[in-house]
UniProtKB/Swiss-Prot annotation:
Residues 556-612, 621-672 form the LIM zinc-binding domain. One of its GO terms (cellular component) is cellular bud. The modification Phosphoserine is found at residues 43, 63. InterPro entries: Znf_LIM. PROSITE patterns: LIM_DOMAIN_1, LIM_DOMAIN_2. Residues 24-192, 222-258, 279-341, 514-537 are annotated as: Disordered. This is Paxillin-like protein 1. It comes from Saccharomyces cerevisiae (strain ATCC 204508 / S288c).
Amino acid sequence: MYNSIYGSPFPKINPKVRYKTALERAGFDTKPRNPFSSQRNASTGSLQASVKSPPITRQRNVSAAPSVPVTMKSAYTASSKSAYSSVKGESDIYPPPVLENSERRSVTPPKNSNFTSSRPSDISRSISRPSERASQEDPFRFERDLDRQAEQYAASRHTCKSPANKEFQAADNFPFNFEQEDAGNTEREQDLSPIERSFMMLTQNDTASVVNSMNQTDNRGVLDQKLGKEQQKEESSIEYESEGQQEDENDIESLNFEPDPKLQMNLENEPLQDDFPEAKQEEKNTEPKIPEINVTRESNTPSLTMNALDSKIYPDDNFSGLESSKEQKSPGVSSSSTKVEDLSLDGLNEKRLSITSSENVETPYTATNLQVEQLIAQLDDVSLSRNAKLDMNGNCLNAVDRKASRFKKSSAYLSGYPSMDIPVTQQTSIVQNSNTNLSRQTILVDKGDVDEDAPSESTTNGGTPIFYKFKQSNVEYSNNEGMGSQETFRTKLPTIEALQLQHKRNITDLREEIDNSKSNDSHVLPNGGTTRYSSDADYKETEPIEFKYPPGEGPCRACGLEVTGKRMFSKKENELSGQWHRECFKCIECGIKFNKHVPCYILGDEPYCQKHYHEENHSICKVCSNFIEGECLENDKVERFHVDCLNCFLCKTAITNDYYIFNGEIPLCGNHDMEALLKEGIDNATSSNDKNNTLSKRRTRLINFN
């Protein structure tokens, strides 16, 4: 029981059995190998001689590619097969078939090397030992040999041009003697697909540095063949270019730069050169004779003539002609437009109308446009007659100038009420077929209000009607004569809201004069701002809401300048908004500067001294005339007292509830006989004074100013 509970849960280890280690269980190969076998360096990827190195356990290299043994065919053809079979049986790695062409070159080993062994380790050892001895004697020997062979190869390029001779000479100059390949092998290597060739290059680069150098020397012949072919192509292209240059020179010499009369006849534009003066003359002759524009829709599409082409081709010569044509065309357009509307014009009106029509009128008037203009004119006539009925004070009708086009776009004139903000300009009228409307409009016009330079007859600006605007007359009426007309004018005015009065101040001023004549209850604020009327007035204008900056922000509230340096502001958000310069922080009533001895009182977001604060706040005691701060008593007449100051005159008790005022000045509590006091009086006066005694009741409440 003891061992089964507290013992080891694992079975006991058998000493006769060899258990796998952690590396073996993980899959690593921990078996010892031949110490003379080639090992791959993980950092450089090159083969190093392992003769003098101690036996190392072989591990799997994940990053490096599997090494492929190099088979030598020429010197040991029989042993290469056995080596291949041994490699196949030992590591189960088959060399790729692509490497057959690249590995057929054999190396003639030095005399000291031994190729009797069939293991690939002996091959790598025989290859690496001469390179080690050569690198120990002279480390730069291989590079100097390559430079010398490159020079010899460059010198022999001109002498022997056949690829076979080049390959033979390059192979003799290399430090390693390689066997020559067959013609079939070279053709087979050249016929490789790009994918197989890239795979061959990758596998060659992945092998050891010595084998890589051997492969580079093997590929030297192929490179020489390619270079020879490229050189032949370059020489042929140079010869072709030289022949082409000679042909170009011959072509240039054969060119004839003399003028050809046939070519000139084909290229010149005879209508432009011959007809241009005539076309210009015809344009000058025909422009003043433009007929009147017909009211049709077909005339809207302009036609492209030869004159327009001439103006585009010759802009400098035809510029003056264009100006003259503009000046000559504009009267024609104006005359046609006025003829459609049957208007009679002066010379001055004709001149103004031509300018406006040339600027504003782009298309001629159609029949539908004419009907719309007549309808607008009738509506304007109705509005003018309505305004004439409202004009009971002798206000004259005035029109807006043609240049003030922004007023013509609006339909505010249809409302029938005058707009006083528009300046008074020239006097015009709309000519209608009916003479009654014309007479009714011209009767109300005052000659003193019409400008002298205004046109005598009515005109239209491009067919649109001119709208009448009103000017407020400055005629003052007496109390007897003017009140009747003002009363009638007042009854006809509708009720206008306060938002409308902000945009129509002249109507407000007129209403103010009427109210001032009747009552003097209205008053003006001290700052000269908005006017307030009495409670029975029909119009009241509210004060505009001023923007308030947070405490410590915005310009100085006293001078309006930016606050730099020392500033004064309230640390509480609900006390004072904005900020001041230190020297500008004063009482708004007396101008005394605030400091440690002069406190600041805040009332209505304004700073006051103590005296003016209590005057504005009505917090001065009526008994002692001192300032009230804290609790106080207030009666129904908004009179305030200190709690200790309001006492009964007779018994000297403090009054906290309702009390009485005897003869308008003496406070009395409710504990006394009021009827006896009315008859006898307080000082026991004679009965003759009984009729003069008065008594009134006051109600009080307790308030706190804190």
